[in-house]
């Protein structure tokens, strides 16, 4: 599939979790549409690899800016946001695609497993949204797209991840109600099972994929491009009357 969706020329987009499968795909689509993309991730090596891919896949796009950041460190996030605004003069789009699961059944889940997931997935999203919103409010424009998950409905073995992603949905709806008067929209994309490299690396990948093909209304596993297309719409100027929504990209499997 080609990377094509609207015109983002002159726009600046910052994507957290930018070296991951979903974040990097969204970055490719935004860059191909003319946006100046800042890919932020805690993994410097993965960022370097992703930056090389960008040069090969979208050679005519504006220069990519990789940035190493820990989303749970408010000082680091604030510094990055301010640096982007100072150098580019604006910040139009924030996509928060960072996060990870650490699965265990409830009775076996440790405090550390709970805290680690909630800290990154929920608190990290709050910090990034808050700091981006400070810049967007000043300009009177912004598109905030958070990555939730189908798990926000509740998944067995994922009490931590499900709670964090449900929190992301609540956070997004609150932000939408607070910042709409400032020209800022906030929406969540809730992917189902998407075939990323990290999923393919699982020993049980084929079993997981077969179950998705069986249970989904659309009989296939999702692709990163499916999620990127949803992000692109919600990040676009044309989505100015859409806010506080959760867009499921799950092949019809909502819960």
Residue ranges and their predicted role:
Residues 188, 210-242, 251:
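C-terminal helical subdomain
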